[in-house]
Regions:
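Signature of the first transmembrane helix
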Residues: 9-69, 158-159, 179, 183, ...
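Transmembrane alpha-helical segments of multi-pass transport proteins
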Residues: 97, 101-108, 116, 168, ...
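Interhelical loop/hinge segments that connect adjacent transmembrane helices in multipass membrane
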Residues: 1-9, 13, 119, 145-150, ...
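Helix-loop junctions and terminal segments of transmembrane helices
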Residues: 31, 35, 62-80, 140, ...
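N-terminal membrane topogenesis motif
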Residues: 1-30, 71-73, 81, 145, ...
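Membrane-water interface segments that mark the loop-to-transmembrane alpha-helix transition
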Residues: 15-28, 53-116, 280-301, 358, ...
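Membrane-interface junctions at transmembrane-helix termini in multi-pass inner-membrane proteins
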Residues: 74-81, 127-150, 332-361
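Hydrophobic alpha-helical transmembrane segments
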Residues: 148-196, 360-368, 379-402, 444-456
Length: 479
């Protein structure tokens, strides 16, 4: 592919990533704000019920359609709808089985959650699952502005619903049903849009054996990933009281800023690389560029939240959840690893079996680490095991990606940039914490947050952009 072609892809990738980022930004801010508000206003028991409900919704909503939502992003651009309906019809019995497994899982929680709340969780999960499916389908159809508008409207309704529920002081069931309803409204709007399009629903599906194989691999991988991500919280719900779970949840809450950034870059890369005949070296250069961009945002945020973790918990939770800080020390390290989105690269180049095996490694190492560390760390072993398992998974992905495109690690990862950034930020934030320590908590957080924002701006608009342009152009010229 020539330089102009790759430059067009680069521009489209990061323009689309901007839409994804903006679409998620308001929702992330609102969810984070609700977490803070509910932590302060609700009892630990009620807060645990609320977040426990979301654990099951977030775990099972992507699993009810198994690997279909993620596979939508890699289907052929001119036949996404026909492939979607073909997969939906062919594997309908599997989706029904997933629903039955979900119902069985909820049944074992009747001693900690009321039957009425469990029914509401089930209904909400169904609507959230459909919403996720429609979200990815709209992304695949490149309806970026519609995606942005609908997510903006959904976020506002989500906030209004929580605000009304908090001041109405009614049962948790009403809140969960309300979330299900606004999810239904969003999905209905997407459906009406797609229905108006002439997309060749009845086009013949080519290479059915390939798509069947990919669906199976993605389904297994989705199950493993979701279980690995939420297994610790499931275990804590059964092991501890609901109040104890609320402490664990706040300590291991994965800051949405990291997930949002990775999701935006990952979805955009997946869509653009699958829609264009991009060579391996060009894709590697684009991938390397995304790591520089991602680390320019994620690393300053990591050091801010890690170095200033105690003041952060004191300020936002008013000292109520200080028991969560030791858990946070372990779980925050996942931010370093999230930037390395090798699974996206492997998926685009049809290596889903590698992704699946990496997920198996992640799960086994995670469980093994928890078993080994639990006698020494207690419940802190759960977030530590999660980070260790993810590290082994990414190491495996790096090894397989190098073999796939016959490239060195420096062709994929900007090692010099990452190392220099880590050292510089470690020294800077350590010094900043020492300087700000005598101040009041609100002043410490405010000043550190402003400085972190400035650092991110400088990295993304000056240093990161220069490295991106230089490395990407050089790589493409030698292709």
């Amino acid at each position: 592919m020539n330089n102009s072609g790759n430059q067009n892809i680069n521009k489209k990738v990061f323009l689309q990533a901007k839409y994804f980022f903006l679409a998620r930004l308001l929702q992330v801010i609102i969810v984070f704000g609700i977490l803070i508000l509910f932590s302060l206003r609700l009892s630990k028991e009620n807060y645990g019920l609320y977040q426990g409900s979301w654990v099951f919704i977030n775990l099972f909503a992507p699993l009810l359609f198994l690997g279909l939502p993620q596979q939508l992003l890699t289907l052929p651009g001119n036949g996404a709808i026909s492939h979607f309906f073909w997969l939906l019809k062919k594997y309908f019995p599997y989706y029904v089985t997933a629903v039955l497994i979900f119902i069985t899982t909820l049944f074992f929680l009747h001693q900690k959650f009321s039957i009425a709340l469990l029914i509401c969780i089930f209904i909400c999960t169904l609507f959230q699952s459909v919403m996720l499916l429609m979200d990815n389908l709209v992304i695949k159809l490149n309806a970026d502005l519609l995606f942005l508008k609908q997510n903006f409207l959904y976020s506002l309704l989500f906030l209004a619903l929580h605000y009304a529920w908090l001041y109405a002081e009614t049962d948790m069931e009403w809140l969960v049903v309300g979330i299900a309803f606004i999810g239904f409204l969003k999905s209905a709007a997407y459906f009406l849009f797609i229905r108006k399009l002439n997309l060749g629903v009845h086009l013949e599906v080519a290479d059915t054996l390939y798509f069947e194989k990919q669906w199976k691999l993605l389904s297994l991988n989705e199950i493993l990933n979701r279980f690995t991500t939420h297994a610790d919280k499931l275990a804590i719900i059964f092991l501890l009281s609901i109040s104890g779970f609320s402490v664990y949840y706040n300590g291991t809450y994965e800051l949405p800023f990291f997930a949002m950034l990775v999701s935006a870059l990952g979805n955009s890369l997946s869509v653009q690389l699958s829609n264009n005949n991009t060579g391996a070296k060009s894709a590697a250069a684009l991938f390397k560029q995304s790591i520089v961009t991602g680390s320019s945002v994620a690393f300053p945020l990591f050091f801010f939240f890690y170095i200033f973790s105690t003041p952060v918990f004191q300020f936002f939770f008013n000292g109520k959840y200080m028991d969560s800080v030791p858990l946070f020390f372990f779980s925050i390290f996942i931010a370093f690893l999230r930037v390395l989105i090798f699974a996206v690269f492997l998926q685009v180049f049809k290596n889903n079996h590698t992704i699946l095996f990496g997920s198996i490694i992640d799960l086994l190492v995670n469980i093994g680490s928890v078993v080994i560390l639990y006698p020494f760390l207690g419940i802190d072993a759960f977030p530590a095991g999660f980070v260790i398992g993810t590290a082994f998974q990414i190491a495996y992905y790096i090894y397989k990606t190098k073999k796939l495109i016959n490239a060195g690690i420096r062709d994929l990862i900007p090692l010099t940039w990452l190392l220099a950034l880590i050292v510089a930020l470690t020294l800077f934030y350590s010094l900043l914490f020492f300087i700000l320590q005598p101040l009041q908590t609100w002043a410490i957080i405010g000043i550190a947050a402003i400085i972190t924002t400035a650092i991110i701006y400088l990295l993304t608009h000056f240093f990161g952009s220069k490295i991106n342009n230089k490395k990407t152009v050089t790589s493409l010229e030698h292709e």
